[in-house]
Amino acid sequence: MISMVFKRKEAGITDYSKRLKLLKSREKRFIVRITGKGVIAQVAEYSDIGDRILFTVTDKTLAKYGVDLRGNNIQVCYLVGYIAGIESEKNGVESAVLDTGRRKFRKGGRIAACLKGFTDAGIEVPHGEDVFPDKKRIDGKHLKSPVKISEIVKNFKKMEEKA
């Protein structure tokens, strides 16, 4: 007898056992995907006919907020997570669970930076405080030309108050 394997499992795209655990939680999912050139953050909820994506934030979305950064480094990941958190509040999302897909979660990594931004915006996600990157790395002090992330976040808050 030949066993049939799901096409997405065979291609290495979907880990169905991990997906089943996430869906059993009945929470909305905060999906983070790191690509070769950028970062994608989404909030999705389960539906019988397929997952329903509530919204998507990418590194390209930062331009709408007046931030001239692109890529998939820790600073961009933090800002994408923060904007995703702001969008979550607008859409009535109060809590979510992290969905990293097939990628491994690393303490202090880019996915952790995205999660930090999401939780800093006020959304509840189960996590340990020791998984986040250092504040120095989020502010970019290890770079030659650091970006002042804290100032950018303050500008986001001012824009929220005006709206």
Curated annotation (Swiss-Prot):
Could you tell me the keywords of this UniProt record? Ribonucleoprotein, Ribosomal protein, RNA-binding, rRNA-binding
Question: Listed GO cellular component terms?
Answer: cytosolic large ribosomal subunit
Q: Which GO terms describe its biological process?
A: ribosomal large subunit assembly; translation
What GO terms are given for molecular function? Answer: 5S rRNA binding; structural constituent of ribosome
UniProt superkingdom: Archaea
Q: Which InterPro entries match?
A: Rbsml_uL18_euk
Q: Does the keyword Ligase apply?
A: no
In the record, the note on similarity to other proteins reads: Belongs to the universal ribosomal protein uL18 family.
What is the stated purpose of this protein? Answer: This is one of the proteins that bind and probably mediate the attachment of the 5S RNA into the large ribosomal subunit, where it forms part of the central protuberance.
Q: How does it assemble?
A: Part of the 50S ribosomal subunit. Contacts the 5S and 23S rRNAs.
UniProt cross-references to NCBIfam families, sorted A to Z: PRK08569.1
* Protein name, per record: Large ribosomal subunit protein uL18
Q: Which organism is it from?
A: Thermoplasma acidophilum (strain ATCC 25905 / DSM 1728 / JCM 9062 / NBRC 15155 / AMRC-C165)
